[in-house]
Amino acid sequence: MDEILKLLQTNALESRENIAKLTGLSAAEVATRIADYEKRGVIRGYQAVLNEDKLDLDTVTAVIEVKVTPQREGGFNTIAERISKFPEVRSAYLMSGTYDLLLFVEGRNLREVASFVSERLSPLEGVLSTHFMLKTYKRLGVLMHQDSSDERLSVSP
């Protein structure tokens, strides 16, 4: 992968000047390459990695495994693209193994996610199980909890 892209993945706010120093390119060349990556769709956007615990957000993320029958025309793409268009679906992946699709669905609360699953997703043939994340330890390469103290109680016979 291009060194500029690696640096931007680590810190999308890195200055063009600093990227130039780190890569040995001029700041103008760095800016030109980044603009080209954006134009060609190599860079699809920029996001901040948020620690939701610090924001006191009331969001629930559900991980949903979906088994589907491939369509005669379009294989898995037809159903995957249809599911991906739901605004509640934050990410969708084609998987190998027992399940065909892995979805990350977000809602304001458990009731909202459950409503999405029961009213919009479940009517689509093949939804087998739903798993809810309880805690995020690492997101997009960033550790969410720096406190190393272990607050669990010891278990003894």
Features from the language model and the residues they span:
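A compositional/biophysical signature of low hydrophobicity enriched in polar/charged and small residues
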Residues: 1-157
